[in-house]
Amino acid sequence: MRIVSLAGGIGGARFLRGLKAAAPESDITVIGNTGDDITLFGLRVCPDLDTVMYTLGGGINEEQGWGRADETFTVKEELAAYGMQPQWFGLGDRDFATHIVRSQMLAAGYPLSAVTEALCDRWRPGVRLLPMTDDQTETHVVIEDERGRRAVHFQEWWVRLRASTPALEIALVGAASATPAPGVLEALERADVVILPPSNPVVSIGTILQIPGVRDAVAAKTVVGVSPIIGGAPVRGMADACLTAIGVETSAQGVLELYGADLLDGWLVAEEDAATSLEGVAVEARPLLMSSPEATRDLAAAALELARKVAA
């Protein structure tokens, strides 16, 4: 089976680990979100791509779900001693090496897709990991604070402000002129099924779908999504703040309607959200918490089984 999964960071990466276990013989391509990407200390940082790469490659900090295992922060401490900003984004020493390699390759003229492939040569994630685009796109958030109405990078809103300042608008800067990275549309064309894992529907999955041509290519296939909302609350993170910013209810129903019947064929929800429905979409209730490798594998298997049902 040829599977394509769109993915953000922690939730998407953990689901993908279960997907590999549920379909070990399948050809899996992952289209990763790059809207979170940011330049820090002169280095290009790709948080979601790296989280997928580290998680599937066995190098992730399992407790927090991002960053490297056995990490140290000597460089961060030294930068802080010099007064270098920003200090709210913590890059570890091992993580710095990834960003240095990426930035040197980008400066040498390699596209992000080629750089990502080279980085994965070390980590062997067991999937083909593609950025959604080679073009620089960044998610920015419009807020209003003591400095007035202004736009900040998504990472500043998410990490420094912890989404505590309401988002007035969320925009993917550069999306209109971006093109899918090499291999993205080809993978979607060949796919037997497309999976939308329980990643943030606004700034992860939604961002990928904003790249021209991607949503149409996804919608042409059998598509099953997994709700990132259980009982009216995000499984993790602050997806509720993102949904509120675009006027969508924080519920499995709200996210289902956001994606729409033109995109989804199947939708997995938690058992307490079993009443969720939308004409044209097959909805099934399953345990959604990825509380163990076995539970995560079973969730991925349920998504694939639903895909088989709706494709029949």
Residue spans for each PLM region:
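Electropositive, gly/pro-rich neighborhoods at or near active sites that engage anionic ligands
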Residues: 32-172
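Short internal beta-strands
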Residues: 29-33, 222-229, 265-271
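Redox- and metal-dependent alpha/beta enzyme cores, enriched for Fe-S-associated oxidoreductases
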Residues: 208-246
